[in-house]
Amino acid sequence: MRLLVTALTTVLLAACTAIEPAPQAPQAQPLVPMPLNPAMTEIFDGKALRVILCGTSSPLPDPGRAKACTIVVVGDKAYVIDTGPESWEQLQRMQFPGSRIAGVFITHFHSDHIGDLGEFRMQTMVAGRRQMLPVHGPRGVANLVTGFNLAYEEDARLRLAHHGESVIDLASSPLIAKEFGKAFVGGLDAEEIILRDGDLTVTAFEVDHDPIRPAVGYRFDWKGRSVVISGDTGLSANFTANAKGADVLVTESLAPNLIGMAQQQMNAAGNLRAAKIMADIPDYHISPLDAAKTANEAGVKLLVYTHHIPSAQVNLPPYFAGVAAIRPANTWVIGWDGLRVDLPAGSTDVQQGELLPKPN
């Protein structure tokens, strides 16, 4: 598949000298321990509601980004929203403590949102998780959890045989399904409080990803601060209503102009299957401009774009055409894997930082 913009960089190698030196025996290099990330202590201090992006791409290839994944940190617990392929690797790059993950929330069952669920099962167990990992989701989550448990149960037994019970707790290794949304029947008007934990309330709400049903977003409210994660969605009144007054809205972005160009190129190349997909996807993903309009209507403080389609071109000027005209520059950000947003308790501040460097 040809990318929309192809950057060809020619590197000229210096000519070898006529006489090459004799090869040297390789020198042993000492192992240098990786320094601990001090941010991993700070983010669990209980002073703020925190958001971390751990996957910001889509099924279209982008080597610098994992597929869909967002983390919300509350107190000493972390909650993962979607577990797209490569997302666990990004958490490892951040040195994120897997034992702090207290639950997973699935927005819908496309592969780019669930592909690393098995890795989360295994890696959090190895990191020290000592209770079954809840996986919250709408109708269908039980089948998802059953499948990943079956696929990974032998892995857990093999690791127990090798490392012993001091490392592997076989009884707590499985995922456990937490299904909700009996009223989520595609009317795009339903919401449900699915978790209360101290000062934290998590609400699931229907979104329009038709024909994908059910599909949901999540709202996290804690001590007067709030974060909304839309999942994959188009415009809907229910989406806007549940984003009302949020400090942060994390939502996807599909650039219809660039996807249209991709469709034309694929048709011209005779790749009709890929062209058909490019023609189909704009009708169930929100554009950057429509996301900005939704954020404005809902009174959102910071709009964070993620799940970029196509993510390899996200920094091209046409991608966010029109957004700057309706939303000030300091109220929206192009998300990357490692973006961190802090919402301190008892404050209205919205603070941005990074756990991984922003790509060029």
Give the positions of each predicted feature.
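Cap/insert and terminal regions of metallo-dependent hydrolase folds
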Residues: I19-E20, V216-G217, K223-V228, G234-G338
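Sec-dependent signal peptide recognition
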Residues: M1-A7
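C-terminal motif of bacterial Sec signal peptides marking the signal peptidase cleavage site
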Residues: L12-A15
